[in-house]
């Protein structure tokens, strides 16, 4: 079977690297930080949270950037909440927003309402002018349970978009072969995925040192230094560190030294659509 790298026109042993700035639209700091990473740094793609209060600002500023949808069914912060775009009572918690935890959502979410909400987030993004390149799922909500994953596959297929899925032992933890199931529907996904959770510089260096052939996604959550993000997010310092790493001029040299080639999701999306 042809590798994704070869299908994209690269040597079969090429090390292709996608650096993602996640969660644009969630806060002003994350939106500004994401665009800084894309325009001034080495980020090659990003994701937008359409239920986020700053998603409209992200739409006004995107200027054709390689951006996907961070399909959002949770509102994980204690003092800063968002909820569904649709009328979806089963997707609300007692505070009137999305549930804070994945387990809470799984316990009472109606799958028809989940499907409508995911479609609405994609439709709003397109209405606002985003040229969507892929889908991701916030907190893995749509990945780790088969009935929810069915929704993700359905909306990805209809939208003709690749999906960012976890790799490694994630399928073992989930208990079902979600990567194979997506591939059977013609949905493309990168070969490897890692999410930075603190220590961004060391994490990226370790990833580059162990980089395998194929397409690898490293996801960051950059944010500018602002009182807003410090007040609402206990991980604010890590987000600011993510931005520092993504805009560090020396990082590009380290990427070159590792023999990696930077790409985005647009190439993968176009390949998937060409195969339909």
Kindly label every feature range from the protein language model.
Residues 5-76:
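Active-site beta->alpha N-cap acidic-glycine motif
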Residues 78-106, 234-237:
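Active-site gating loops and adjacent loop-to-helix segments of metal-dependent hydrolytic enzymes
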Residues 9, 34-40, 56-68, 81-93, ...:
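Acidic (Asp/Glu)-rich catalytic clusters
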Residues 119-188, 194-201, 209:
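Catalytic domains of cell-wall/extracellular-matrix polysaccharide-remodeling enzymes
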Residues 163-164, 232-276:
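C-terminal domain-boundary segment and adjacent tail
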Residues 16-27, 103-115:
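Active-site mouth loops of central-metabolism enzymes
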Residues 16-18, 43-47, 64-70, 132-136, ...:
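Structural preference for beta-strand elements that scaffold enzyme active sites
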Residues 22-24, 49-53, 70-74, 138-140, ...:
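Active-site beta-loop-alpha junctions enriched in small/polar residues
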């Amino acid at each position: 079977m042809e590798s994704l790298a070869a299908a994209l026109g690269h040597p079969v042993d090429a090390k292709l690297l996608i650096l993602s700035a996640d969660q644009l639209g969630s806060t002003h700091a994350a939106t500004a930080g994401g665009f800084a990473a894309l325009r001034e740094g080495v980020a090659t793609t990003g994701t937008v949270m359409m239920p986020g209060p700053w998603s409209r600002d992200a739409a006004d500023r995107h200027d054709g950037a390689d951006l996907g949808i961070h399909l959002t069914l949770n509102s994980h912060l204690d003092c800063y909440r968002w909820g569904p775009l649709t009328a979806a009572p089963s997707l609300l918690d007692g505070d009137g927003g999305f549930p804070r935890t994945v387990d809470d959502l799984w316990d009472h979410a109606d799958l028809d309402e989940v499907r409508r909400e995911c479609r609405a987030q994609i439709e709003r993004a397109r209405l606002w002018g985003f040229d969507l390149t892929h889908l991701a799922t916030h907190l893995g909500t749509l990945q780790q349970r088969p009935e929810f994953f069915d929704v993700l596959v359905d909306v990805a297929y209809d939208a003709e978009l690749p999906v960012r899925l976890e790799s490694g032992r994630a399928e073992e933890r989930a208990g079902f072969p979600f990567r194979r199931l997506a591939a059977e529907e013609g949905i493309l996904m990168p070969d490897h995925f890692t999410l930075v959770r603190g220590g961004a510089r060391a994490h990226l260096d370790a990833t580059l040192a162990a980089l395998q052939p194929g397409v690898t996604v490293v996801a960051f959550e950059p944010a500018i230094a602002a009182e807003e993000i410090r007040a609402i997010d206990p991980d604010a310092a890590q987000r600011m560190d993510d931005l520092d790493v993504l805009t560090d001029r020396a990082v590009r040299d380290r990427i070159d030294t590792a023999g990696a080639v930077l790409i985005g999701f647009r190439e993968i999306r176009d390949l998937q659509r060409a195969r339909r």
